[in-house]
């Protein structure tokens, strides 16, 4: 009811989409809450907010967040490092999906709608939450073309991305060996089905004069609802997890700038002190007690090189003890 003027701007024919979207939203929120309760995730979440609001370094924090937002979310450079085809595929799928959601969800709930002007029926008003933000002519306006084809554009982007990804998943032996049908292929097939049936609606309306429109619209509704129901339980859920990487970026930056933790054996720095202390807390929360007897209080106070050396020493001592007992 919020933003739709007590459902005055709501289209009852979209009821199934509404229930699917609401279920997906509540299920995703529940899973996200459970996910945040995991000790490692909770540490990143808490530290991310703490670092974001550090008063002496607000400007630096904002610049870091802006860079991470542009590099990891807009340009998605973390995928480009794995190959250009994967980068293009992920870029098309992610932006196509986000664009479709940004357009479809407000339309479903009545937050955005169009009305003809009273004195000029050929002019459409664009209303967001009941507030007029613009207007365009229905016959000769590039705004009309843009507004009415945003979902088609998003469908084309998603189909390109899904096609490239399916080609990789069906051709590369290394990918085939580790992929799972439910986790890797089902989301791609759902995205493809939603996008293809959405484009078929446009083809039916403009090229076939409405032939088969009702059947295609029902199939499209089924595919959309199936995808919405899949989101909280499958791979598409990482859409909501990915923004936490902004906090991880701040965490890595803070660890790199702070003095490192010092190894209790060799005296050299090896990792961020904050990271070591947080890791000790996480290990304790999950029931792993890595405290040691002797000069070293905790296993996490030992650098990786000394850990490998200690393992060799312990193995040697164990073998010598076994040989001695055998000789006796």
What are these model-predicted stretches?
Residues 176, 253, 276-279, 316-319:
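A generic "cationic amphipathic patch" detector
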Residues 109-110, 116-117, 252-255, 284-287, ...:
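Short, surface-exposed linear patches
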Residues 247, 278-289, 319-328:
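Short cysteine/histidine-rich metal-coordination sites, predominantly Zn2+-binding motifs
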Residues 1-264, 310:
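Membrane-embedded alpha-helical bundles of multi-pass integral membrane proteins
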Residues 263-267, 303-306:
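Short cysteine-rich clusters marking metal-coordination/redox-active sites
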Residues 291-309:
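Cysteine-rich micro-motifs
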Residues 269-275, 308-315:
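Short functional micro-motifs and their immediate structural scaffolds
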Residues 269-297:
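Short recognition patches in nucleic-acid-associated and regulatory proteins
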């Amino acid at each position: 009811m919020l933003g739709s003027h007590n459902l005055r701007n709501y289209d009852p024919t979209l009821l199934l989409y509404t229930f699917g979207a609401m279920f997906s939203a509540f299920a995703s929120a529940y899973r996200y809450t459970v996910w945040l309760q995991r000790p490692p995730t909770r540490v990143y979440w808490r530290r991310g907010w703490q670092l974001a609001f550090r008063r002496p370094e607000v400007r630096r924090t904002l610049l870091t967040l802006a860079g991470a937002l542009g590099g990891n979310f807009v340009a998605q450079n973390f995928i480009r490092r794995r190959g250009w085809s994967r980068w293009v595929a992920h870029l098309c799928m992610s932006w196509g999906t986000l664009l479709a959601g940004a357009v479809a969800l407000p339309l479903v709930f009545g937050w955005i709608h169009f009305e003809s002007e009273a004195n000029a029926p050929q002019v459409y008003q664009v209303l967001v939450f009941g507030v007029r933000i613009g207007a365009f002519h229905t016959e000769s306006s590039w705004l009309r073309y843009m507004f009415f084809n945003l979902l088609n554009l998003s469908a084309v982007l998603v189909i390109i991305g899904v096609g490239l990804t399916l080609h990789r998943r069906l051709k590369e032996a290394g990918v085939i060996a580790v992929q799972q049908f439910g986790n890797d292929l089902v989301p791609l097939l759902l995205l493809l089905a939603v996008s293809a049936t959405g484009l078929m609606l446009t083809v039916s309306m403009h090229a076939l004069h409405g032939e088969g429109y009702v059947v295609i619209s029902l199939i499209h509704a089924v595919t959309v609802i199936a995808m919405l129901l899949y989101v909280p339980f499958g791979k598409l859920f990482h859409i909501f997890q990915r923004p936490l990487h902004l906090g991880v970026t701040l965490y890595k930056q803070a660890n790199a700038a702070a003095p490192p933790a010092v190894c209790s054996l060799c005296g050299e720095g090896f990792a961020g002190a904050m990271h070591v202390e947080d890791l000790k807390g996480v290990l304790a929360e999950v029931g792993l007690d890595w405290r040691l007897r002797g000069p070293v209080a905790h296993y996490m106070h030992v650098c990786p090189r000394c850990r490998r050396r200690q393992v060799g020493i312990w193995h040697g001592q164990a073998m010598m003890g076994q040989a001695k007992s055998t000789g006796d």
